[in-house]
Amino acid sequence: MATPNNLTPTNCSWWPISALESDAAKPAEAPDAPEAASPAHWPRESLVLYHWTQSFSSQKVRLVIAEKGLVCEERDVSLPQSEHKEPWFMRLNLGEEVPVIIHRDNIISDYDQIIDYVERTFTGEHVVALMPEVGSLQHARVLQYRELLDALPMDAYTHGCILHPELTTDSMIPKYATAEIRRHLANATTDLMKLDHEEEPQLSEPYLSKQKKLMAKILEHDDVSYLKKILGELAMVLDQIEAELEKRKLENEGQKCELWLCGCAFTLADVLLGATLHRLKFLGLSKKYWEDGSRPNLQSFFERVQRRFAFRKVLGDIHTTLLSAVIPNAFRLVKRKPPSFFGASFLMGSLGGMGYFAYWYLKKKYI
């Protein structure tokens, strides 16, 4: 039985080798950057991560694992193909959420608990620590900015930028996503009313409740006045971070060290800030918030963090983010349900369906 912190002792011998028994479950390569840890110092038991490549929470967990230099066996759970609702995954997490990690006899299905567990469990002289020593000034700073950054309503930014592209500049979200999500919103009320009056044994009341809450949330995110309010609050958060980065420059003036948000050492706060800026740029908000020259320290930070090995490995080139999310799904769909013919025309048709997968991903679970 899961404990309140979502850490479940269990016999893990039953978990599937792969959702689709595809190449997606191959272990990730160990980083070769200077910050990578030595395999000799890792626990014998493997660390297994179930994630979706474009899930915001999954990305942050993967960045933490990569920055610490840990070997991790990654298993992709495709949200566009609803693999998070399949029985094998629901045995890991009834909440149908990614990420989930398995290590030793533990299943951990909460984003915050995963990060804390990885940082607490994988330690040693040759393992990178992302949390400064408890009681230090740097530790207090990391806790402060972790709370601040994790509180940002990324799902609201995402839905808002899809529904109101006029608020963005150079967004990497395809334009047809707006029309698609609006079409589904228009039909959602009718569809849910039908489900309420139909006898569908596979649809439980919790499921209907969850769908109604999702619809209500998206409708709230469609409110322009609400969006402008939270984007204004985002600007204040980024102002605070800009000022903090300026303090680091003044505190360490003349010293030969690379400056990060909480000091000279790269910490969890930098992981979270880097992931946040990457997502905001994808949504088309970077020109408004730092690329216009209004926050030069933030701009410098983003340029530096993108050059780190872990960020290149996990997030790749931001201009191919959407492409990297949807192409594997086309091939996995072909592998799961092979057609009677497999020619070039079918492959092109599969790739042509990338927009469909992109939309469903953006609608269902962007964080």
From Swiss-Prot:
InterPro entries: Glutathione-S-Trfase_C-like, Glutathione-S-Trfase_C_sf, Glutathione_S-Trfase_N, Thioredoxin-like_sf. SUPFAM superfamilies: GST C-terminal domain-like, Thioredoxin-like. Residues 45-126 form the GST N-terminal domain. Keywords: Coiled coil. Changing R141W: In a colorectal cancer sample; somatic mutation. Residues 174-341 form the GST C-terminal domain. It holds the Pfam family GST_C_2. GO terms for cellular component: mitochondrion. Belongs to the GST superfamily. This is Ganglioside-induced differentiation-associated protein 1-like 1. It comes from Homo sapiens. The lineage of its organism: Eukaryota, Metazoa, Chordata, Craniata, Vertebrata.
